[in-house]
Design a protein with these regions (language model features):
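Conserved phosphate- and dinucleotide-binding cores of soluble alpha/beta proteins
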Residues: 4-7, 15, 97-213
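N-terminal active-site beta-alpha-beta segment that forms phosphate/nucleotide-binding
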Residues: 6-132
Length: 213
């Protein structure tokens, strides 16, 4: 007869899921981590820990790194084992000016740069401007243009996608309840680099997205 052996391992399932993601979305690679998280913070911590070694393999001398913002990326940096690099810069991919400590505690650009002995650059603007006109004025400033140009040319972008309710921008009250309900009604399903996105990953046509940097 024929003996068939199958190992029912969660790790094997993760590999199969990763392969399926690569094929479906034409990716170069994907990693799926086992999680028993009971809340968003536990999930962020587990994803942060799992992504550390993957990202570490992508970092080398003479490169620029763009870094997003939020709970998951802060957990990634907090658990990341750094190493000295030469001619490396880390650029924030979102605005960095704020008066709220609740926002600052999720900023990780400074720490990642320190762990790599790298230059650190910030976008000199808030994440959410008070109006679209203010945003237009800020992005026309020479200093902003210079750093924004460098952010667009990074060799490696480290970012995360937040759920609609769990996105850090929502948790720290950078949008009002009224704005949140309104953008949800417009079809938003998540948040990427501050922008609310729909199920096709398009930026939702909503005034809040006109104020994001």
């Amino acid at each position: 007869g024929i003996v068939s052996i199958r190992i029912n391992s969660p790790l094997l399932e993760n590999i199969e899921l990763a392969d399926a993601l690569v094929k479906k979305y034409d990716l170069q690679a994907a990693e799926v981590c086992l999680s028993h998280a009971t809340d968003e913070y536990q999930l962020a911590r587990q994803i942060g820990a799992a992504s550390g070694e993957v990202i570490r393999r992508c970092i080398h001398d003479s490169m620029s790194i763009g870094l997003g913002w939020g709970i998951t990326l802060k957990e990634f940096v907090d658990q990341f084992v750094g190493f000295p690099c030469k001619d490396v810069s880390v650029v924030s991919l979102l605005g960095s000016l704020t008066r709220r400590s609740s926002v600052t505690r999720f900023e990780a650009t400074t720490e990642l740069a320190a762990r790599l002995d790298a230059e650190c650059l910030y976008l000199p603007a808030p994440i959410v401007c008070d109006s679209a006109d203010t945003r237009r004025l800020l992005i026309e400033q020479p200093l902003f243009k210079d750093i924004y140009s460098r952010a667009l040319q990074t060799d490696l972008a480290i970012v995360s996608i937040g759920g609609l309710d769990s996105a850090t921008i929502r948790l720290v009250d950078l949008v009002t309840d009224e704005e949140f309900d309104s953008v949800r009604a417009k079809g938003a399903i998540g948040n990427f680099l501050g922008y609310y996105i729909d199920e096709q990953a398009g930026i939702v046509d909503h005034p809040i997205n006109d104020r994001i940097i």
